[in-house]
C-alpha cells in the first residue's frame, strides 16, 4: 500500500494574490503546508512572472475546479510595442523590432478583431503538447513548431491606458484556454509594429476577485493558525454562477451514494447542470431530470 498523505481534511477555497517569480504549483504547495491540508490544487495556471488571482482548492473543493476553470476570467496586461520576442513576453530574446507606433485610434480599431469567438495559436514557449512533449521543451532546444490554432471566446478587450508611445495597458475578459501572450503577439502583427507582453495580472477568475485575495506574506505569517483558516472561503463559493436545487432527506442519501436523488427545484430546465444542497451544504453536482438530480460529482466535505 502507498503511504497515506498526511494533513487535515479541510475543504474550501483560499484565494491567493500570486507574486511574480513563482510557479502556480509552488504557490499551491505553500498553501497546502500553511493550512496543513491533505489535498490542494488550483483552478487555472498563471505563468511564473504573472501576478494576481490564483484560486487554490482544498479537499472536496477540488471537485469543483472544472466549473471555475470554465468560467470567464479578467486580465490586465501591459504590451510593449515595437519588439517581438521568442517567448512573446519580456523574458524572451528580442527577435525583431519595428519603429512603427500606431495611434490610440488605430489600436482601438484593431482590438475589435479579437472580440467574440476567435482562433489563436499558442506561443512556442507553452505547455501545449506536441507528439507527447511540451512545446516549451522543444522550443528551448531551438525547434520551431507549427502549433494548431485553438478556439477562444473573448468577451471584451479594452484599451485602458497609453502611458507612452512604446506601451499600452489592456484589459481582457475571456473564457478558458486563452493565451494573453498570443493576443499581444497577434495584435502587434495586426498593427504592423510587433509586440509582446511586458506584465500580466489576473484580476478575477469566475467568482474569485483579487480584492479578496491574500498575499503569500500574510499566508506564511498566519500558517497553521485559526486566523488563516478564517481566510478560507466555503466550497460553495465556486458554484455561485450555477443554479442550486435542494435535496430531500431521502434524495440526499441517494445522492451521497452516487445515485439519482429527488430534489426541489424551480425554473430548472431538463438536463441543466446544477448543484444540490442539503442542510445548506453542497452534496452533489449533476444534471436535473424530471425532479431528480443525476450526479456527476459527489461532494463529501467534512463538517
Swiss-Prot record:
<feature type="active site" description="Nucleophile">
    <location>
        <position position="47"/>
    </location>
</feature>
<dbReference type="GO" id="GO:1990481">
    <property type="term" value="P:mRNA pseudouridine synthesis"/>
</dbReference>
<dbReference type="Pfam" id="PF01509">
    <property type="entry name" value="TruB_N"/>
</dbReference>
<keyword id="KW-0413">Isomerase</keyword>
<comment type="similarity">
    <text>Belongs to the pseudouridine synthase TruB family. Type 1 subfamily.</text>
</comment>
<dbReference type="InterPro" id="IPR020103">
    <property type="entry name" value="PsdUridine_synth_cat_dom_sf"/>
</dbReference>
<dbReference type="Pfam" id="PF16198">
    <property type="entry name" value="TruB_C_2"/>
</dbReference>
<dbReference type="InterPro" id="IPR032819">
    <property type="entry name" value="TruB_C"/>
</dbReference>
<protein>
    <recommendedName>
        <fullName>tRNA pseudouridine synthase B</fullName>
        <ecNumber>5.4.99.25</ecNumber>
    </recommendedName>
</protein>
<dbReference type="InterPro" id="IPR014780">
    <property type="entry name" value="tRNA_psdUridine_synth_TruB"/>
</dbReference>
<dbReference type="GO" id="GO:0003723">
    <property type="term" value="F:RNA binding"/>
</dbReference>
<comment type="function">
    <text>Responsible for synthesis of pseudouridine from uracil-55 in the psi GC loop of transfer RNAs.</text>
</comment>
<keyword id="KW-0819">tRNA processing</keyword>
<dbReference type="GO" id="GO:0160148">
    <property type="term" value="F:tRNA pseudouridine(55) synthase activity"/>
</dbReference>
<dbReference type="InterPro" id="IPR002501">
    <property type="entry name" value="PsdUridine_synth_N"/>
</dbReference>
<dbReference type="GO" id="GO:0031119">
    <property type="term" value="P:tRNA pseudouridine synthesis"/>
</dbReference>
Amino acid at each position: 500500500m502507498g503511504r497515506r498523505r498526511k494533513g487535515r481534511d479541510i475543504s474550501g477555497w483560499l484565494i491567493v494574490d500570486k507574486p511574480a517569480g513563482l510557479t502556480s504549483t509552488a504557490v499551491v504547495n505553500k498553501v497546502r503546508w500553511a493550512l496543513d491540508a491533505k489535498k490542494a490544487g488550483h483552478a487555472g495556471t498563471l505563468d511564473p512572472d504573472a501576478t494576481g488571482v490564483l484560486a487554490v482548492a482544498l479537499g472536496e473543493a477540488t471537485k469543483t475546479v472544472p466549473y471555475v476553470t470554465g468560467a470567464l476570467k479578467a486580465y490586465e496586461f501591459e504590451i510593449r510595442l515595437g519588439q517581438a520576442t521568442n517567448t512573446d513576453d519580456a523574458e524572451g530574446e528580442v527577435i525583431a523590432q519595428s519603429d512603427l507606433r500606431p495611434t490610440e485610434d488605430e489600436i482601438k480599431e484593431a482590438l475589435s478583431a479579437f472580440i467574440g469567438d476567435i482562433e489563436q495559436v499558442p506561443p512556442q514557449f507553452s505547455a501545449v503538447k506536441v507528439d507527447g512533449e511540451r512545446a516549451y521543451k522543444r522550443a528551448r532546444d531551438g525547434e520551431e513548431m507549427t502549433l494548431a490554432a485553438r478556439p477562444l471566446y473573448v468577451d471584451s478587450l479594452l484599451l485602458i491606458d497609453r502611458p507612452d508611445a512604446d506601451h499600452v495597458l489592456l484589459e481582457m475578459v475571456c473564457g478558458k484556454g486563452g493565451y494573453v501572450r498570443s493576443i499581444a503577439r497577434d495584435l502587434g502583427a495586426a498593427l504592423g509594429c510587433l509586440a509582446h507582453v511586458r506584465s500580466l495580472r489576473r484580476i478575477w477568475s469566475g467568482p474569485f476577485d483579487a480584492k479578496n485575495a491574500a498575499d503569500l506574506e500574510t499566508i506564511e505569517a498566519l500558517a497553521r493558525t485559526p486566523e488563516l483558516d478564517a481566510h478560507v472561503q466555503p466550497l460553495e463559493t465556486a458554484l455561485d454562477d450555477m443554479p442550486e436545487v435542494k435535496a430531500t432527506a431521502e434524495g440526499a442519501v441517494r445522492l451521497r451514494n452516487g445515485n439519482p436523488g429527488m430534489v426541489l427545484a424551480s425554473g430548472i430546465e431538463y438536463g441543466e447542470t446544477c448543484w444540490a444542497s442539503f442542510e445548506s451544504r453542497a452534496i452533489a453536482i449533476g444534471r436535473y431530470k424530471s425532479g431528480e438530480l443525476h450526479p456527476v460529482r459527489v461532494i463529501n466535505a467534512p463538517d
